[in-house]
């Protein structure tokens, strides 16, 4: 949802646009997680760190409820949003479903698991929000979308690394299962690109975020340094816009 709201704040959203964005993005995330949890239940049952509700007895009715809600959200977007925003939303939902669900199950195809995540979890939600408010194409928006794409890659690679043993057992040929060394290099590269990009795009915000990010990185590991610096650096200007400072 955060990526989509950053896109929304590329312009000046009305209350209607903001409400539509929040509801449709929340519905999209619910769909993505419900479908992923449903089709990952077998492998997640082997992983004690996973908290998959379908492993703990949640029935198919939850998927039906989420799907019905997604249909309502899609109809609202189709009725109220401009065509580019609708196209981005539809693409994000379809990719999120195709990532987990057969017969496509992009998660099980090395390379496509990463590429699809970059778009459906990073670039497309941002573009949906920006198009919803009719934000003009600009270098700042392009750079922001690029950073979000890299950060989405970082998040995906981190998850694939943590799940690689269980994905291998389940038969998912993820990038980390098939090419662990390349994946590890991409993990570091995407994290570095995200941090450097956020710092160059919003240097003042990055300077504000740096002390907290260094502390979190020292206490919790370098990945939390990346999370906090990217999130805070990109969010502070949006918060300033929201508060009417710009």
Predicted feature locations:
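Membrane-embedded alpha-helical segments that form the functional core of polytopic membrane enzymes
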Residues: 2-39, 85-98, 137-158
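Solvent-exposed interhelical
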Residues: 24-78, 149-195
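Extended hydrophobic alpha-helices typical of membrane-associated regions
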Residues: 103, 115, 199-246
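A cytosolic-side transmembrane-helix exit/cap motif
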Residues: 37-44, 105-115, 134-139, 160-168, ...
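Small-residue-rich segments of transmembrane alpha-helices in multi-pass membrane proteins
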Residues: 2-7, 54, 114-130, 176-181, ...
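Hydrophobic, membrane-inserted alpha-helices
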Residues: 2-6, 68-76, 188-197, 211-215, ...
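Intramembrane alpha-helical segments
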Residues: 54-136, 217-222
């Amino acid at each position: 949802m955060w990526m989509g709201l950053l896109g929304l704040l590329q312009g000046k959203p009305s209350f209607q646009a903001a409400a539509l964005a929040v509801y449709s993005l929340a519905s999209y995330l619910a769909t993505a997680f419900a479908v992923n949890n449903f089709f990952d239940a077998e492998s997640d049952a082997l992983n004690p760190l996973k908290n998959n509700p379908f492993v703990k007895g949640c029935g198919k009715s939850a998927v039906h409820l989420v799907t019905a809600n997604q249909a309502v959200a899609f109809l609202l977007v189709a009725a109220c949003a401009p065509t580019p925003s609708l196209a981005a939303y539809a693409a994000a939902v379809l990719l999120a479903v195709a990532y987990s669900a057969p017969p496509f199950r992009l998660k099980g195809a090395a390379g496509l698991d990463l590429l699809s995540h970059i778009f459906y979890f990073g670039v497309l939600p941002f573009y949906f929000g920006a198009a919803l408010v009719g934000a003009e194409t600009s270098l700042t928006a392009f750079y922001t979308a690029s950073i979000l794409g890299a950060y989405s890659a970082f998040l995906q690679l981190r998850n694939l690394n943590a799940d690689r043993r269980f994905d291998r057992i389940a038969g998912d040929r993820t990038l980390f299962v098939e090419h662990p060394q390349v994946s590890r290099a991409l993990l570091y590269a995407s994290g570095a690109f995200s941090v450097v990009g956020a710092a160059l795009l919003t240097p003042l915000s990055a300077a504000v975020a740096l002390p907290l990010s260094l502390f979190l990185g020292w206490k919790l590991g370098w990945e939390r340094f990346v999370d906090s610096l990217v999130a805070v650096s990109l969010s502070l200007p949006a918060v300033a816009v929201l508060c009417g400072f710009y």
